[in-house]
Amino acid sequence: MSLFRKREPPASGPGAEQALPRAAACFTTPAMTRRAADWLGNLGGCRPLGILSDDCDDVVWQCTAEKADLLLLELDFSNGVEDKDVSGRCDIAVEVRRKLPECRVYLLCEDGHPEKLAALDKAVELKLIDGYCIGDLSAQQVRTWLDETAKSMKTAASPPKNQEPGRRNKA
């Protein structure tokens, strides 16, 4: 018996269905990460992945290995947990985007931390992350993020409008 599942080959050929976004979830505990990945799987519209370690290098490696299109990172504002604060999670986002420029990154945090709103807004303004959610994450919000991700995947896969497929424009 193999412990590792074979990866499904990407959809290709005429009539192949558009590939679903690969959505990675990295929460503050492995149990919450598993629960989030299961929830994403039940929601549909993506291929979920749970990243059980929230160490920056581990997250970057796994996102790169799995070619994640979307990354959900949970924040933790407990005392003494700086690596899970806005700046620590933005560090992960920057490193993931260095390897996967098209990967969309969203931060999730619980209610009750209005003092963090300015930092979250600044992270979006600086394009370190694509967005955030404060409070309970709704299925509608995730579907919106998945739709945005699928749209950006489609845009990235299509040739520029002034270029014919299979041909390169001269610079």
What are these regions (language model features)?
Residues 100-104:
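A short helix->loop->beta-strand "cap" motif at the edges of active sites that frequently abuts
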